[in-house]
């Protein structure tokens, strides 16, 4: 176990170092859903200009309108286009429909419009429509064949988007399995996707998990806020947020069927900033916390316990509010931006602006009296590694503990954890609960700074 902990910590630090080579003005893992069920949307050109002003690098469309695809030409934005569920029967029965679609909606614009994937349907396998379910794979195969005929088979991927309900079990994450009722259908679908190197697209929404269990602990777990965490009884991994738990449950389900190497893409996730007064969870503060902390978590490249050291491609839901959506009122209020291009809440998506939830690097100052957050004696390296991953995943500047940084030496898990745990405590508000870390931390009045390594405090 000790060797695994040291390896895990080292891998984390290596990936943390590598992330500095990526441009601060782009986040290649981050996309957004561009829904258009609204009567108050800005013009298409205004939307393109808005996205170009952000760090968002991908956009998912729910259709394939030629004007929209063309508008994103030469922008560098990667595009996912899609078929509605209602298109599936015709696609499945008539290969010519797929061929014509590829000719008119892909070849006419590619590569100037950087189309990277085509989604065939949304949440089909959990629709309950057995006929539609049986037609899904033939429809996808016809689209794939049309792309192959156009020499685009290896460049434009074919997938379909699933709800978390495709899993019959998701907790603990290591026990994740697909609904056995999907049986051969899911296996055939995964064989197709594996053969074509296509991603498995899923829509995890921690918001709905909180809605089903609205407790303060669940909210903190869903919003990436400090919490006691949950230990997976199957493998001992500790989870500090619901997003990682849901994604790893999908990974476990894929692994259980022999397809652990299929890439997982989060097709949509978000949190409503408004809703009816009787709805639990929607609020501006909760939406900002979830989306902002999710972005910081992805940016950190910590990954998940089962897929460490990488950022999963994630499409936020959604670009704008959609007042024509049906269902609960909250369904209308997932928008990141307002029609005038201003932010609904600021999570640092605009280029050349700092994420407001990401503290700046503290300026070293002379040591002074104050309070500092440090590990308790006797805490294991395993627990401290989890604290490092959590704190750095919240967006604090962990550069000083990277090789060459002022706090890299001594190169021990305990020393690195002490620095980042304190920095998180100071940045998060200096409340006692900001120095809890599942009861592995304590406050001290003794300044732990040493040499050039400065531990900031409230009085610094």
Curated annotation (Swiss-Prot):
InterPro entries: Glyco_hydro_17, Glyco_hydro_17_plant, Glycoside_hydrolase_SF, X8. Disulfide bonds join 373-435. SMART domains: X8. GO terms for biological process: (1->3)-beta-D-glucan catabolic process. Optimum pH is 4.5-6.0. Gene3D superfamilies: 1.20.58.1040, Glycosidases. Glycosylated. Residues 352-371 are annotated as: Disordered. This is Glucan endo-1,3-beta-D-glucosidase. The gene is OLE9.
